[in-house]
């Protein structure tokens, strides 16, 4: 029985990145032998075991044969005579098909180290095309490492999309990969790769249709709404590691994809149109409610936030109430970050100041300091409390904004 460290742990060690978890492949043994040594079985579709002391995963070397559409149609062979190279050959990318022996030596039959050095994502074998999830994984690794996809791999991904393989992706898996991609260092690369192979139109049509839609050059020097959207996502990634903020940034302008072409380059009412599209996207991918709620707010109100310095105190208070700032101050901060990303996600304007966010923060703090307790203590009841609370908060906002403007 031979044991090798495989996959992401080897890759990340070679890249000098922290290793979060270790997976091992075991060659030349059987499930019964591992059970006899105290390993605990956990794999449903193929033999995977947990080490009795470390609880790390040990999988029997295996081969996989495609038997049906999608990512579940596989027949697995984990016999003792399956070799290490055969196991590595079933893996998706060469950078994930490197093994480390117990003595520290590396086994790299598919040139993964060379591709790591060159920053290239390359498929190991034509079997890459048997699992549509690999389209998403390749794009996600591009978002993590900022690597390029090898031309032949991109061509294979395009062929998979043309063959309809991407249509077999289940919503939960798409969302899982999207959420992970949003948390990577270069999330815009995920969408660039999907668009390059044609998968964006199949998986995220609401985003694909933004490309080629013009905006006024005065406000958007980049003109193209799709390019703007990816720039906003890029800025959001610099502003915050919060994937909810990044998702809201990604979806803030979906409504522009539905603007009648005769109205271009203007997009009147795109905020409300965008809300409907955000809800459709979230329902289709079964996006968690927290992501959806923030994305809806940003789609609906981002233009109003950009006008914050021109808003009257009463309008500012209405905005604070509509985004539920007093009950959800943390989400209000997420909301402002996504709006700032939109304002700065424009060619040549990436570093411009965004005083609107700080003005709304000041207004919120001033209004939040006004509570109903003194009003209740003074004997007010019901609607009288609400009316007085509103008036006092408007007054507090007016004073805070006036002081800020100097």
Curated annotation (Swiss-Prot):
Belongs to the tRNA nucleotidyltransferase/poly(A) polymerase family. Bacterial CCA-adding enzyme type 1 subfamily. The lineage of its organism: Bacteria, Pseudomonadati, Pseudomonadota, Gammaproteobacteria, Chromatiales. Magnesium is required for nucleotidyltransferase activity. Monomer. Can also form homodimers and oligomers. One of its GO terms (molecular function) is CCA tRNA nucleotidyltransferase activity. It comes from the Bacteria. This is Multifunctional CCA protein. Its cofactor is Mg(2+); Ni(2+). Pfam families: HD (PF01966), PolyA_pol (PF01743), PolyA_pol_RNAbd (PF12627). Catalyzes the addition and repair of the essential 3'-terminal CCA sequence in tRNAs without using a nucleic acid template. Adds these three nucleotides in the order of C, C, and A to the tRNA nucleotide-73, using CTP and ATP as substrates and producing inorganic pyrophosphate. tRNA 3'-terminal CCA addition is required both for tRNA processing and repair. Also involved in tRNA surveillance by mediating tandem CCA addition to generate a CCACCA at the 3' terminus of unstable tRNAs. While stable tRNAs receive only 3'-terminal CCA, unstable tRNAs are marked with CCACCA and rapidly degraded. SUPFAM superfamilies: Nucleotidyltransferase, Poly A polymerase C-terminal region-like. ATP binds at residues 8, 11, 91, 137, 140. CTP binds at residues 8, 11, 91, 137, 140. A single active site specifically recognizes both ATP and CTP and is responsible for their addition. Signal peptide: none annotated. PANTHER family: MULTIFUNCTIONAL CCA PROTEIN. Mg(2+) binds at residues 21, 23. Comprises two domains: an N-terminal domain containing the nucleotidyltransferase activity and a C-terminal HD domain associated with both phosphodiesterase and phosphatase activities. It catalyses: a tRNA precursor + 2 CTP + ATP = a tRNA with a 3' CCA end + 3 diphosphate; a tRNA with a 3' CCA end + 2 CTP + ATP = a tRNA with a 3' CCACCA end + 3 diphosphate.
